[in-house]
Amino acid sequence: MMPVTNVLLLFVLWQGDLNSLLTRAAAGDCSGVSPQLARMWATPGDSQSRRLAGLALAQCRIAAKQFPEAGSVVGELERDFPADADVLYVSAAYHLKAWNDAVYRMYKNAPASYRVDQLSAEVFETQGKYTEAIAEYRKAIAKNSKGIDLHYRLARALLAQSHDASALEQARQEFAAELRLNPADAVAEYQVGQILTTQLKPAEAAAHFERAVQLRPDFAEALIAVAKIRSGAKRYPEAVVLLERAVKAQPNAEAAHYNLMVAYRNAGRAEDAQREKTEIDRIQKPPEGEFTNFLKRLGGPPPPK
């Protein structure tokens, strides 16, 4: 067995090498230090030293646009240090730069692709430029009318721009087009139901809500919609069953708990209704956390309850 003094000496030397490598990597000498960083990253040992080596190695590989190799390191870092701010920062940088590089190559190599129009539409959508987004989605559909998700995204952009009668009908038609391509799209079914409800066509809407629940039995919003229909028909026990499923699917969904509370009351289950009221109060109460505790230490009031 190696004497303890020798082990400590090796550790100190290893740490010195690491500090030197980190300094060189930070100065931009990635080509000169990456092989040694990779060896340190692959060597079992002190976890924090491996973390530092991994962070530097990932950043060097990102800078060199070696995204598959960087992704491997980032993935292991996230697994071993899931709450580490430095790891999460490097992960964000990796995904952003990999995305930007892929987008650049797509615009360069396939400028006429419908995917370019789709991506442009998505960018406009995030900027709140819905007129431009709608135009780009329509270009994409003109090039590939059978592209999955294009009609859905166009419908969503139409609704984001306006809820007037014309926009609602156009959106309904686009959701319907999506369903013709992908009949298993529960969200599109639900959206059609929502529009038909707004258009005062409850019977047609109900069929779409029912279908959405069939497609996705844990779809909380669709379960709530069907439960409201059951409650409207005074079929309260059936509404309760549906809403209990919605609450199970989304335990912190206030709308699910509220509708379940009302259904319990209508079904004569006062104690269960009170339990749901307590749960709603819990959801609405701001969580106690670091910021609240910080305010308390300063003598300031916590957020209003």
Predicted feature locations:
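Helix-start (N-cap) detector for alpha-helical repeat units in TPR-like alpha-solenoids
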Residues: 51, 85-86, 114-115, 148-149, ...
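Terminal, low-structured helical/coil segments at or just beyond the last alpha-helical repeat
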Residues: 105, 258, 262-305
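Alpha-helical segment of the N-proximal tetratricopeptide repeat
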Residues: 16-35, 56, 60-63, 116-128, ...
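Structural signature of tandem alpha-helical TPR/SEL1-like repeats
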Residues: 63-72, 95-105, 127-139, 162-177, ...
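Structural marker of alpha-solenoid helical repeat scaffolds
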Residues: 43-46, 80, 109, 143, ...
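N-terminal leader/linker segments that initiate helical-solenoid repeat arrays
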Residues: 9-52, 285-298, 302-305
